Amino acid sequence: MEIKPLGDRVLLKPMEEEEKTKSGIVIPDTAKEKPQKGKVLAVGTGRTLDNGTRVPLEVQVGDIVVFSKYAGTEVKVDGEEYLIVSERDILAVVGHEN
């Protein structure tokens, strides 16, 4: 199933953090924080201004982004977990993957 975000929404695949600390201690699932980094899989058509002009989104498919801790809506499709967030909840682009 294809997910196409609408307007200024962005579809992300959350990236899990390391399972171990640098010193080798394994972090149990109960102590893990919610991911705040993800890969952009799809973007909406952009934000519409009051005068009807459409402003394209700044992020692109393939960008690795950092987003607000409690941002977006989690969705599960075909056993995979995704996050749909508004572009304003994305704090920074930290890389790009193809």
From Swiss-Prot:
Keywords: Chaperone, Cytoplasm. Its main location: cytoplasm. Transmembrane segments: none annotated. GO terms for molecular function: ATP binding; metal ion binding; protein folding chaperone; protein-folding chaperone binding; unfolded protein binding. InterPro entries: Chaperonin_GroES, Chaperonin_GroES_sf, Chaprnonin_Cpn10_CS, GroES-like_sf. GO terms for biological process: chaperone cofactor-dependent protein refolding. GO terms for cellular component: cytoplasm. The keyword Chaperone applies. SUPFAM superfamilies: GroES-like. It is found in: Cytoplasm. Together with the chaperonin GroEL, plays an essential role in assisting protein folding. The GroEL-GroES system forms a nano-cage that allows encapsulation of the non-native substrate proteins and provides a physical environment optimized to promote and accelerate protein folding. GroES binds to the apical surface of the GroEL ring, thereby capping the opening of the GroEL channel. Heptamer of 7 subunits arranged in a ring. Interacts with the chaperonin GroEL. HAMAP family: CH10. Belongs to the GroES chaperonin family. This is Co-chaperonin GroES. It comes from Coprothermobacter proteolyticus (strain ATCC 35245 / DSM 5265 / OCM 4 / BT).
